[in-house]
Amino acid sequence: MKFGSPPGDAAGGVAAMWTRLLVERASWTLIDQGVVSLGGFILNVQLARYLTGSDYGTFALFMGAVFIFRAVDFSLISYPLSVQLCATPRREHAALLGSTAAIAIALAGVLSVLMFAGTVLLGRGDIAYATTACFLSWQAQETTRRFLSADFRHRAAVWGDATSFLGQAAIIGVLASAASLTLQSALYAISAMFLAGAAVHVSKLQFARPDFAAIVPMFRKFFELGKWSLLTYEVVLLRTQLFPWALAVFAGTAATASWQAALNIANLMNPIILGIGTVIPQAAAQARLSGGITGAWRAARGYILFGLPPILVFCAFVLLAPHFALRLAYSADSPYLDMSLCVQILALAWAAEYVGEMIAKTLLGAELGGLAFLTNATGVVGAVVALPLIIPFGVLGACLALAIAILIRLIFAWLILSWLLAKETSPTAIRAEAQVPR
């Protein structure tokens, strides 16, 4: 497989136009995701500094639960919407968004009940209302954000995301300086900023009255489109969330806090991983219509190459100066400064995660969700097999096990993609395509 070049036989002015479009879309999605990740990183650093290890570990577990529920919303709402918008006339977008919003509200209600019940069952009834409020407000912010990004409006999403995520970092800083920061107050403060960001997003969207008669058929269609995405993202989350929960069981929530502290450094690559990953499904879906899986991959790899240099530069920095990165993030007297080796392992793992995740996103965009699920399932198998490393090595074992799982997923994803491209470009496939009536 070769990287580079625009889709099809584009040349000259068409190639230049395609390149400008790619750069514009990729740039704004990276800027938007950069704002989100910067705010999230500052928030996590502040909470790691000022909360007890036990409370910060609890916060990390809560975040994991939110991501699991967010995957349901993304797969059954945001991903199908991004596919549908490509084929819907612009004059009908408001009607589509109105009906989609109604489905999203109903789904959020169900998930919020599960969030409340889960918090109580885990023995933290004291923060059940706070976690549920935070989850619902996050749902509102993230769903409206996805409404914008589904139409490639990443530039329009920046202000709402800045309000939410940079606002959270600011308000947590104020609470910490006033000695009023607790896990509960942090969750309520985060909720308030998510609602403010959602309001900004809504101001940039147009909604028509929902067509309630069409909502059930629409949800069925969304479910058909999103079921493989749901399975895919849940196994991805299972692969990553398996380790903090296992650490909490075998070593306590303080070990989970150390894991999260190391992961926060690697997560600085998330603006690229999540940003490029946001735009690839839509780009691959559009290119597949005329170019098949080959066209989808050609479209996707341009975005992958766009994000690869900063991934490699950051990975090299962390490998060369892990202690400096930890000290810069958590201060010179932080209990997390002994996590250097863990940070190095996770940095390498996240670089591999970038490529593997983008291949999986390409498969989803090309409506090959079954193969995307199979690809990610291999990572879960690798995680389960490597999980016992936690017992002798603790947090270090968790980092090694996750790196092994990510590497297995990457290898399998590359093999799947190579097989698909070879199959589509084989002489037999080309002859069959030539015989199809036009």
What residue spans do the PLM features occupy?
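Signature of the first transmembrane helix
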Residues: 3, 18-75, 227-254, 315, ...
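Interhelical loop/hinge segments that connect adjacent transmembrane helices in multipass membrane
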Residues: 5-22, 129, 155-160, 181-189, ...
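Transmembrane helical elements of multi-pass membrane transporters/channels
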Residues: 24-41, 157, 163-164, 168, ...
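Membrane-water interface segments that mark the loop-to-transmembrane alpha-helix transition
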Residues: 24-37, 62, 66-119, 126, ...
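Helix-loop junctions and terminal segments of transmembrane helices
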Residues: 40, 73-90, 262, 266-292, ...
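Hydrophobic transmembrane helix module of multi-pass membrane transport proteins
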Residues: 102-231, 348, 355-361, 373-378, ...
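Interfacial segments at transmembrane-helix termini and the short loops linking adjacent helices
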Residues: 118-131, 320-351, 396
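Small-residue-rich transmembrane alpha-helices that serve as helix-helix interface/gating elements
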Residues: 184-198, 377, 381-382, 396-414
